[in-house]
Amino acid sequence: MAKVSVLNVAVLENPSPFHSPFRFEISFECSEALADDLEWKIIYVGSAESEEFDQILDSVLVGPVPAGRHMFVFQADAPNPSLIPETDAVGVTVVLITCTYHGQEFIRVGYYVNNEYLNPELRENPPMKPDFSQLQRNILASNPRVTRFHINWDNNMDRLEAIETQDPSLGCGLPLNCTPIKGLGLPGCIPGLLPENSMDCI
C-alpha cells in the first residue's frame, strides 16, 4: 500500500504567457512518517518525437515528512526555448509532475499544454521562427492523467509494476481548443504523448 497519496494538484495562474513560471499547488497525505525525502519534479516535454527534448524545469526535496496532510506550491521557470524544436514550439505538448521516494517514481501527473499565438494575424500566418514572446500557454487543468507505480517503501529494491488509474479529485480549469479523438478523449493532434492506457479524470 502506498504511504503517500496525492490528494489534489491545482494549476495556478492559467493561462499565462509562455515565459511565465509554472505554478502548481500540490496537496498530499502520508499514512505514516517518512524518514527520507520525497523528490518532486516538473518536466516539460519538448517534443513527442524524442525524450531527448524533455526539460526538467525544477526538482525539490521535501522531507522528512511527518504523517498527515501537507500542501506546498511548486514553482518552476518556463522551459528554455532554444532546447525546443521549432516545429514543436506551437501547438500541444505535455507537462509532467513526478514524485519519487528512494529513487523510485510512485506517481506521475500529466497535463496537456497548448501553446498558441493570441494575435489573430500571427495565428493565421505564424512566423517561420517561433516568437515565444507572443505565445500563450494554456494547461488543460481539467483533465490530468495520473499514473501510479507500486514501489517498495522500505528500501531501494526495484520498482514494481505500474498501474494506470483515474483520480477525479485532481485538477480543475479551462479546456483546450483541440479536437478529441472520438471515444478516447485525446486531442487528435497529439496521440501518443501520454500512455494509451492512462485514464482521464472525470
Swiss-Prot record:
Highly expressed in testis and at lower levels in colon, small intestine and thymus. Pfam families: ASF1_hist_chap (PF04729). GO terms for molecular function: histone binding; histone chaperone activity. Changing residue 198 to A: Reduced phosphorylation of ASF1B by TLK2. The modification Phosphoserine is found at residue 198. Residues 1-155 are annotated as: Interaction with CHAF1B. It comes from the Eukaryota. Transmembrane segments: none annotated. Changing residue 36 to A: Abolishes CDAN1 interaction. Phosphorylated by TLK1 and TLK2. GO terms for cellular component: chromatin; cytosol; nucleoplasm; nucleus; protein-containing complex. Histone chaperone that facilitates histone deposition and histone exchange and removal during nucleosome assembly and disassembly. Cooperates with chromatin assembly factor 1 (CAF-1) to promote replication-dependent chromatin assembly. Also involved in the nuclear import of the histone H3-H4 dimer together with importin-4 (IPO4): specifically recognizes and binds newly synthesized histones with the monomethylation of H3 'Lys-9' (H3K9me1) and diacetylation at 'Lys-5' and 'Lys-12' of H4 (H4K5K12ac) marks in the cytosol. This is Histone chaperone ASF1B. The lineage of its organism: Eukaryota, Metazoa, Chordata, Craniata, Vertebrata.
